[in-house]
Amino acid sequence: MRRDEIQSLLDNIPVTPESMCSYFADRPSQSRAFRVDGDLPPELFDVALDRGYRRCGDIYYQQTCKHCHLCLSYRVLVQSFVARRSQRRVAVRNSDVEWRVVEPVLTSEKEALYLRYQHSQHYVKDIARPDAERFAAAGYDEASLLDTLEFQMYTNPRSTRELQLHCDGQLLGFGTLDLSANAVSAVYFVFDPDHARRSLGTMAILAGLDWAREREIQYYYLGFYIPGHPKMDYKRHFKPAEIRDPVAGKWIGAPDAEIAALAD
């Protein structure tokens, strides 16, 4: 199948009904999505990434909201990337951290770290109560969260890899990297909340970019950049980069002025 035929197929997948947006509670969300049982050929995955698709478990999806276009696919130009001063400081701060890219294997250590990370990011802190009690008070239980972990980070194509950060034998963070023919797509990253001052999310991106550069990979996809969003705005600091205009369906350079224009 030719590239243009694949593009046409992806662009004509039916749009899902409206559901609650994960980023803005007052807005509906819609997407195109398809499920893959097994591996997606790298060349086809390249086209899907280029069309703004991402993967979660065995589902590939593209945001197609009618009245909001703030979820901007963002990719760093790997071979041209230059770390900012603040990013270089993060690298120095983590000079004692060893990073490695390996095949993903779920362990009890990762399960425990995932639960602690989710609680620190999404639930009210109450250090006087055990984790299980805090999750229950927030309306979640550990079993359902661990099911999400397995689906989100360990239901993967065979080409998927895991980025790990270690210090003195301790696992500080781990994340899922999807590989296509000419790109890396960062799916999800988890870090130890006790080491928040290390800026491990930034460190993981820097490590992933180094790994991609060594392999002469062209693009490093950071997922959705949402201008001004407290959890999704940081991606604009990794440049040079391109953003995908969700209306025109084309990739453009990502200086701040053009990002602001798309956000309006």
What are these regions (language model features)?
Residues 1-106, 214, 218-264:
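Terminal substrate-recognition subdomain of acyl/acetyltransferases
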Residues 42, 108, 202-206:
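A structural signal for well-ordered alpha-helical segments within the folded catalytic domains
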Residues 59-67, 73-197:
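A conserved beta-strand-loop-helix scaffold within acyl/acetyltransferase catalytic domains
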Residues 104, 129-135, 194-195, 205-209, ...:
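Short C-terminal domain-edge/linker segments immediately following a structured domain
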Residues 117-118, 139-141, 203-207, 215-221, ...:
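Noncatalytic linker/hinge segments flanking ATPase motor cores
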Residues 163-244:
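Aromatic (often tryptophan-rich) hydrophobic motifs at membrane interfaces
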